[in-house]
Amino acid sequence: MLRFTHRGLPSSTRFRNIFVRLNHIYVPWFYAIDVPNSKPYLPTYQTLHSPKKFKPFSVDDSNRLEKASKRQERRPVLVNEDYLFKVDLSHMELSPTYWEGPTYQVRRGVWFDSSNQPLSSDLTSEIEGLYKQLKFDDSNDDPTTTPPAESQDIFRLKGKYPVDKENEGEQKNGSSNKDENESTFKFILFANKQTAFLLSDLDGGKLQLAFLRSNLAQSLPINATMITRSYKYSSSATTKQTSTSFKAAKTPQTEVADGSNSSKSRSIETKLEKKVSNLFNLSDFLQLFNGNASKDQDDAQSLEKQMETDYNNADNSQGANASSKIEDGKNSGASDRQIRSNRRDVDNLILCVHGIGQTLGKKYEYVNFAHTVNLLRSNMKKIYNNSEKLQSLNTAPDYKSNCNVQVLPITWRHSISFQTDAKEENIENPDLPTLSQVTVNGVLPLRKLLADGLLDILLYVEPYYQDMILQQVTSQLNKTYRIFKEFNPEFDGKVHLVGHSLGSMILFDILSKQKKYELEFQVDNLFFIGSPIGLLKLIQRTKIGDRPEFPNDLERKLTVQRPQCKDIYNVYHVCDPISYRMEPLVSKEMAHYEQTYLPHCSEAYGLTSKVLEFGENIWKDLPGTDENNLQSKKTSPEKKEVKLSENLTRMLTGLNYTGRLDYAMSPSLLEVDFISAIKSHVSYFEEPDIAAFILKEILSKHENASEIYVKRKTG
């Protein structure tokens, strides 16, 4: 028995009508990933050629873009993972929602070339206008239907549309030597309801046109470019482009025939060399020392890698896997399963502030803080989805699939133009030279790298620049928070801050001076990662706490600071030369005790887990080492724990509910210090252990510890 609704139609009929109507309006939309329209802070940037690589938006995003386009809405349309990106329909551009980043061309997918890429908006618009003149029978869904006999099937194009060359260099160099008529499409011939051909000339006459009208031309187009009014996704394309950075590490090594120690040692050396090379993957980092690292080609390749990961972190397979035939706006590939929103509920907002080295982003595209924060967000989601323990800490209704945490970058350095920047003239003091003019020429690439990376610390020590930095970061924090609230008006959760390197010092000072640098939100957890706070506050004769530890601290002219937040964490790698402890600044007694160690995440798949596995494997292969020796190292007696006094416990729990501020990443069995020192300071945001720790602390309920046990240092 059919159940009728208030509109007088059976509910099942209404559902079918709604779904058909949804199919009818569905048109896939795409965004470029290879050539940016613009780059932030590079006003001189110009595109040399049109983008050739496009990725599809999800079905939900495409539907909303299509509706907004028809309504001619001026407000940006939020798209992709967590709506972290937006589309400006007036300029057909995709850009980040909350931070500065490259903008990319957006296209409405109606006509596609032989590479399955959407044609440009201008060309598509003109072709569609001509296509409608053919007046195909809407009731006939056969794509091979030819134009009516009385209709004209070939038209001259009004616009100037360049012929795409596979070899960009050939196009660029050859354009000046060829006639304009040879380098642009002038005509279009419609072969059937789904296929057409673009031609630059009609030199072949009637014979060429007759061939293009035949079915054979679709398999072997001659002197023409075939385009189709359909889009088909091949899942193998994504697989081929997938990066396999650790593939070489899995290659079986040649077995050593004899069992001598010397042969085994040589095998170990070979294994060590190859595994270290693959493990740390320093090729990109070492390019910083290469004078050619800032070449346009290198920048384009690295930016394309970031684009494919950052702008496409969401499960866009729902849009990509939809094989769509566009016939008068109809789509046969969309399904109700694919039509879902990228929006998710967020109860915890994390804002990350970068530190030293971010000026490198102006010169080397692959040193990009927004990219590393996107990796942190991605790691958090992957680890959360695989961890029942983390899910059990989440009280949200959708805890199974949503960690309810959002992570956004705060990129402040590019917004400040210091007079000490390498080649910028000193406007305030024109008699002073630029930084490049006082730089010694010896080992120039290394000097430039160190200047770009370490100069910000020297700038921060100077009061004038320090105030400029604090004002700018405060402004960026408030701006990002306001934008987030604008697009997420229902958000009423907690805000947490993460500071990396100098960024941690900046956050420490902002939260310690809230009357001068006021934030528009309360801070819950404050994470310092790879932080030099311990050193800089020691130089400033500043202790950390709510009040002086001893009454005569004030008489000794010691400053005591306490950031306005609930809990403070100081996380670092033992090999990081920039990091320093903070607990001894709370009480000198803590200098006699070890820091606590970051728990190793069993779901981790990054550098830490690979180092641990690698060190254990190498240890087993060492001559004279057996399983019993290795096991004895694991089961060696632990150091005896000492209980802290009530006064010290109260002081520490006033800064962190656990009573511990310093958290070191677990050391591996095999430390390669010279490599670790280079890599450790810049790879925190890529570490799954860091992502898991931040997630755990944010989702956990905090109750102050009544007792604190520590381990005394040895030696």
From Swiss-Prot:
Protein name: Probable phospholipase YOR022C, mitochondrial
Chain ranges of the DDHD domain: 519-700
InterPro entries registered for this protein in UniProt: AB_hydrolase_fold (IPR029058), DDHD_dom (IPR004177), PA-PLA1_DUF7131 (IPR055555)
Organelle transit peptide residues: 1-22
Residue span of region Disordered: 161-180, 242-268, 311-340
Record carries keyword Oxidoreductase: no
Keywords noted in UniProt: Hydrolase, Lipid degradation, Lipid metabolism, Mitochondrion, Transit peptide
Low complexity bias spans: 242-251
Compartments where found: Mitochondrion
Major localization listed first in the record, in broad terms: mitochondrion
Function: Probable phospholipase that hydrolyzes phosphatidic acid.
Entry's EC annotation: 3.1.1.-
Remaining remarks: Present with 736 molecules/cell in log phase SD medium.
KW rRNA-binding (keyword) present: no
GO cellular component, one term: mitochondrion
PROSITE patterns: DDHD (PS51043), LIPASE_SER (PS00120)
Catalytic center residues: S501
Broad EC category: hydrolase
Biased composition, class Polar residues, residue ranges: 311-324
GO molecular function: metal ion binding; phospholipase A1 activity; phospholipase activity
Pfam family, any one: WWE_2
Superkingdom in the source lineage: Eukaryota
UniProt-listed SUPFAM superfamilies: alpha/beta-Hydrolases (SSF53474)
Protein family (similarity comment): Belongs to the PA-PLA1 family.
Record-level GO BP terms: cardiolipin metabolic process; lipid catabolic process; phosphatidylethanolamine metabolic process; phospholipid metabolic process
